[in-house]
Regions:
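Beta-propeller blade signature
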Residues: 1-6, 56-60, 311-317, 418-431
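Conserved blade-ending motifs and adjacent loop-strand segments that build the rim/top face
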Residues: 15-27, 67-74, 134, 138-149, ...
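Repeat-blade elements of multi-bladed beta-propeller folds
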Residues: 22-47, 85, 89-93, 148-152, ...
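Phosphate/diphosphate-binding loops
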Residues: 27-77, 427-429
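Blade-level signature of beta-propeller repeat domains, shared across WD40, Kelch, NHL, RCC1
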Residues: 156-162, 168-174, 393-436
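Electrostatic cytochrome c docking/interface patches
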Residues: 174-195, 211
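Axial heme c-ligation environment in periplasmic c-type cytochrome domains
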Residues: 202, 211-230, 234-283
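Generic long, charged, amphipathic alpha-helical segments
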Residues: 290-293, 318, 322-378
């Protein structure tokens, strides 16, 4: 954008028709690179897809070529996503959104794997999988790859990026405008609605809207039952076997008879409920709208539903576009088994120093870490009062270099405590009275 006139001089897009929340994140980074003995001014932007977008900042032309790949089309009424998306080879992407249903589901234990696979029973994955009303979508990347803290460039023109690799579920469902079902006289007078209130409303709510817990607190989910007769067959909705399987992990709701260990939902109840859902969908069809939200995919230990590492730190050579190294960043702890796993969710950021040090923060273990910029080796770590919540800063005062950490904790599930600390360090060699 021309700062004087506001005119758009050029633009470059990563994800077309983005319905996955795969935005370009972090502040743009400016540097210069050598191409065929010519110095080119470039601007670098990072995407949650894992792509590193590097273009000539005068012309907007990408430094490296890219191609297009075919992807699925969306299935929302009257809407389709783009049939093609950009595919970058260089700079090498530091992550991918593709979730492999066969290999990426957690293998930490049979119990955890079984739980996650059950959560994914109606899900699909792939390369930019199309969101739709009949299937959930599971991808990496809703929180990166890279995230809002962005990356940093060191004095050897290497790009350092903290990134995430844990999956999210994207769901779409029908809802009623203003949620009027439980105040609709035509509906509430139905005898079958009383059956619903007695057996289902404690989880799916009196207005059938269900519950999708915020990822800031957890991953509880009870699907909306609005429009269900439009989406599923009568056979599947009245099958007692399917009902029991779908409620396999619903031990906290009133499905079991404690005396006989039998389900207290019977075939006659399912038949009655199907008739109710059919009537409700007929009455409210003109008021039904589509809602879509995402949620972390967690296992029953509240760990990400994929295999660790769940967070990385990486370095990319900006001249060649090649990844130089990639190491796990942070430690995740299973609060049930007390086991530690390398690489965790991170929302802090990095800075680099002229001496070849990378300083990184933002993991849930509340440590800030110091790395060798040449190889990614961890040199030192320091525990903060709360998780780092923004990139570290460095400054000079009376000839001494200081490093500061904004330590306030995180807002997503698993970050635990929050506060308002700002923690500053300086070199021991500066700790003389005249420099204080």
């Amino acid at each position: 954008i021309d700062g004087l006139t506001g005119k758009i001089l050029w633009q470059f897009q990563d994800t077309k028709h983005d319905v996955w929340d795969l935005d370009v994140v972090g502040p743009p980074l400016l540097t210069e690179i050598k191409v065929n003995n010519q110095t080119i001014p470039v601007v670098i932007a990072l995407s949650k897809t894992g792509n590193i977008l590097m273009v000539n900042r005068k012309s907007g032309k990408p430094i490296f070529d890219y191609s297009y790949q075919s992807v699925d089309a969306g299935q929302y009424p009257n809407q389709e996503t783009s049939l093609k998306q950009k595919k970058f080879t260089l700079p090498e992407p530091i992550s991918s959104i593709n979730f492999d249903m066969n290999n990426d589901v957690t293998k930490l234990s049979k119990e955890q794997e079984s739980y996650v696979r059950h959560k994914l029973r109606n899900a699909q994955s792939g390369n930019y999988p199309a969101s739709n009303l009949k299937n959930d979508v599971v991808i990496f990347g809703v929180h990166g790859g890279p995230e809002w803290p962005g990356g940093a460039i060191d004095n050897k023109n290497r790009l350092v990026i903290p990134s995430n690799r844990y999956p999210s579920i994207i769901r779409a469902w029908f809802a009623i405008q203003n949620n009027k079902i439980d105040s609709n006289e035509e509906i509430i007078k139905l005898e079958s609605y009383q059956t619903y209130l007695s057996n289902c409303a404690s989880c799916h709510k009196a207005n059938l809207s269900g519950y999708n817990e915020s990822e800031n607190t957890g991953d509880s989910y009870f699907p909306s039952l609005v429009g269900i007769s439009r989406l599923k067959s009568k056979e599947s909705l009245t099958s007692l076997k399917a009902f029991k399987y779908n409620h396999k992990y619903s031990n906290d709701i009133n499905l079991m008879d404690s005396d006989t260990d039998d389900y207290i939902i019977y075939q006659s109840d399912l038949d009655e409920l199907y008739d109710l859902f059919t009537k409700i969908d007929y009455i409210t069809k003109s008021e039904q709208v589509i809602i879509s939200e995402f949620q972390l995919l967690l296992d029953n230990h509240k760990l990400p539903g994929s295999n660790p590492p769940w967070g990385y730190l990486s370095s990319t050579d900006l001249t060649s576009g090649k990844t130089l190294w990639k190491v796990p960043f942070g430690i995740a702890t299973d609060k049930i088994t007390k086991k530690n796993y390398p690489g965790d969710m991170n929302f802090g950021g990095v800075i680099t120093t002229k001496s070849g040090i990378i300083i990184a923060t933002g993991t849930r273990d509340e440590y800030s870490r110091f790395y060798d910029a040449d190889n990614g080796a961890e040199l030192y770590k320091v525990k903060l009062p709360y998780a780092g919540s923004s990139p570290p800063i460095t400054y000079m005062y009376k000839g001494c270099q200081y490093i500061g950490f904004n330590s306030t904790g995180g807002r997503f599930a698993g970050y635990g405590k929050n506060g308002d600390a700002f923690v500053v360090f300086k070199l021991d060699s500066c700790a003389t009275e005249e420099n204080i």
